[in-house]
């Protein structure tokens, strides 16, 4: 699933092509995504200007003349900017045609993506209303994290992936950030001191920023808006490296299950 870095890479890529452009046509080839795509978009969106493209958590927010188009990439979604003459393929479900003979095409083989319209204050949308702070913002700091987790018995990795505590951190980047912080993914969140929380926050910010700079991670489906894969997977320290030597101490990387997710860690470096 695309996590915050992949969504931010997508946002930055499409912003240069879409911001300030007018929508001329909408094509929907498959309405059956995670929630049905509204057929009203076919008549509602043409003529509207795309003013800005921002990101909240893993949601892309297209602020248009009369409301906001909300897109979530789901498990396997990607957005491409292409000439309108580009033939569609099997998993190309949705297109925004623009006034420059380009289009934004949404591709999603597994169809867990989301395309929604909201004509009110987008901050009040039910999907966005109760989200935690952005991990790269000043609001996410050691004191904040310590306050949020100090009475929780869940593991620190589960806490990092809780979107009500902090948004956008999925399994890959939780594993990597915990390694860089020297904290085991298995320990109880409530056992962390303020100092450890501050160290973890720094590791989260560093990991996400490096991933964005590397174009995100491309393990299966993800590509940026011009079809290029990310390369952050080449920089993983623990994720997916079960049984391989830790790049820091040489001990073998361990793997365990936490809920429905795999956790990767170095038992020597992470306590």
Swiss-Prot record:
BP-aspect Gene Ontology terms: base-excision repair
InterPro entries xref list: DNA_glyclase/AP_lyase_DNA-bd, DNA_glyclase_Znf_dom_DNA_BS, Formamido-pyr_DNA_Glyclase, FPG_cat, MutM-like_N-ter, Ribosomal_uS13-like_H2TH, Znf_DNA_glyclase/AP_lyase, Znf_FPG/IleRS
Cofactor(s) needed by this chain: Zn(2+)
GO terms for MF: 8-oxo-7,8-dihydroguanine DNA N-glycosylase activity; class I DNA-(apurinic or apyrimidinic site) endonuclease activity; damaged DNA binding; zinc ion binding
Active site positions, chain numbering: 2 (schiff-base intermediate with dna), 3 (proton donor), 58 (proton donor), 261 (proton donor)
Catalytic activity: Hydrolysis of DNA containing ring-opened 7-methylguanine residues, releasing 2,6-diamino-4-hydroxy-5-(N-methyl)formamidopyrimidine; 2'-deoxyribonucleotide-(2'-deoxyribose 5'-phosphate)-2'-deoxyribonucleotide-DNA = a 3'-end 2'-deoxyribonucleotide-(2,3-dehydro-2,3-deoxyribose 5'-phosphate)-DNA + a 5'-end 5'-phospho-2'-deoxyribonucleoside-DNA + H(+)
Residues given in the record as DNA binding sites: 91, 110, 152
UniProt entry keywords in alphabetical sequence: DNA damage, DNA repair, DNA-binding, Glycosidase, Hydrolase, Lyase, Metal-binding, Multifunctional enzyme, Zinc, Zinc-finger
Cofactor note: Binds 1 zinc ion per subunit.
EC number(s) stated in the UniProt entry for this protein: 3.2.2.23, 4.2.99.18
Lineage: superkingdom: Bacteria
ZnF FPG-type span: 237-271
PROSITE patterns hit by this protein: FPG_CAT (PS51068), ZF_FPG_1 (PS01242), ZF_FPG_2 (PS51066)
Alphabetized NCBIfam families for the sequence: fpg, PRK01103.1
Family from the record: Belongs to the FPG family.
Function: Involved in base excision repair of DNA damaged by oxidation or by mutagenic agents. Acts as a DNA glycosylase that recognizes and removes damaged bases. Has a preference for oxidized purines, such as 7,8-dihydro-8-oxoguanine (8-oxoG). Has AP (apurinic/apyrimidinic) lyase activity and introduces nicks in the DNA strand. Cleaves the DNA backbone by beta-delta elimination to generate a single-strand break at the site of the removed base with both 3'- and 5'-phosphates.
Subunit-level organization: Monomer.
The protein's name: Formamidopyrimidine-DNA glycosylase
Species, as recorded: Nitrosomonas eutropha (strain DSM 101675 / C91 / Nm57)
